[in-house]
Regions:
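Active-site and donor-binding regions of nucleotide-sugar-utilizing enzymes
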Residues: 4-144, 148
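Donor nucleotide-activated moiety binding/catalytic core segment of transferases
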Residues: 53-58, 203-232
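A short, charged/proline- and glycine-enriched loop
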Residues: 1-2, 80, 158-162
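Conserved catalytic-core segment of nucleotide-activated headgroup transferases in glycan assembly
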Residues: 12-24, 137-214
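A generic structural motif
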Residues: 25-32, 190-195, 219-221
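Extended, charge-rich low-complexity interaction segments
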Residues: 59-75, 158-168, 172, 226-230
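An acidic- and aromatic-residue-enriched active-site/binding cleft used to recognize and process polar
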Residues: 111-112, 134, 200-202, 226-228
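Short hydrophobic beta-strand segments
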Residues: 1-7, 164-167
Length: 232
């Protein structure tokens, strides 16, 4: 089977890579092409390891039989079954249940999402639903303690007892970013903690700039800039 792993945003890479790894480890007879959207992704960490392109024309010429997409849209004119791989768990987002008619199949994270999309499938009648889990969780499970030494090094160098990760959603309606900055500072002092912050790539730039500047003046806050993998 010819498979395209379609990455419009950088976070899609870590979501889809477990699929590449599974095919490679199992020696499955599939040919994989990655699409990396150059305007939003300035570097591809697996560039020397896999087949990839920045060209939609090359994707078309590849004649994929399946396209995996951790996003809401994909060019309708590309051949192959188009599969949405969900990229989070925020079911309360207002646009989570919108059917945009781009996909033939929705791969869901768990029973709650499956039941809702199965109901939508009955209403629309032009897509299928399959509960697969979320591939990015595979990496987390397999590497659960891989970076314990890195964590201890961070705590040792910062002189802190606890590490706290703050990774808010970008959605303006749901994010805590406008309200929580000073509370994070208090939490760091009360818990003798190092606050590690990583923002979604679609976060408003003014919020990113505000928190980056704030973190630069604090010894107990570490700002992870976009492009860095927060799972390490």
């Amino acid at each position: 089977m010819r498979i395209v792993l379609f990455c419009e945003n950088k976070y899609a890479i870590d979501i889809l890579n477990p699929i590449q790894e599974h095919v490679t480890k199992q020696h499955l007879p599939h040919e994989i092409l990655w699409y990396i959207h150059k305007p939003k992704i300035d570097s591809f960490p697996y560039a020397d390891q896999v087949k990839w392109t920045n060209s939609i024309q090359e994707v078309y010429d590849f004649q994929p039989e399946a396209i995996y997409v951790p996003g809401n849209i994909v060019p309708y004119y590309l051949p192959g079954v188009k599969i949405q791989v969900f990229h989070g768990y925020a079911a309360e987002k207002k646009d989570h249940w919108i059917i945009r008619r781009y996909f033939d199949t929705y791969f869901t994270q768990g029973p709650y999402f499956t039941s809702h999309f199965e109901a939508l499938a009955k209403r629309y009648g032009d897509f299928e639903v399959l509960e697969t889990g979320w591939p990015k969780q595979d990496w987390i499970k397999e590497n659960l303690h891989k970076y314990d030494a890195d964590r201890e090094k961070l705590l040792r160098e910062s002189g802190k007892e606890t590490l706290i990760l703050y990774a808010p959603t970008f959605s303006p309606r749901l994010t805590s970013l406008p309200y929580i900055k000073e509370e994070l500072g208090k939490l760091a002092k009360e818990r003798n903690a190092l606050i590690v912050m990583k923002f979604h790539p679609l976060t408003r730039q003014e919020w990113v700039d505000e928190y980056r500047e704030w973190a630069a003046n604090k010894k107990d806050v570490l700002f992870i800039d976009k492009g860095e993998n927060v799972t390490k």
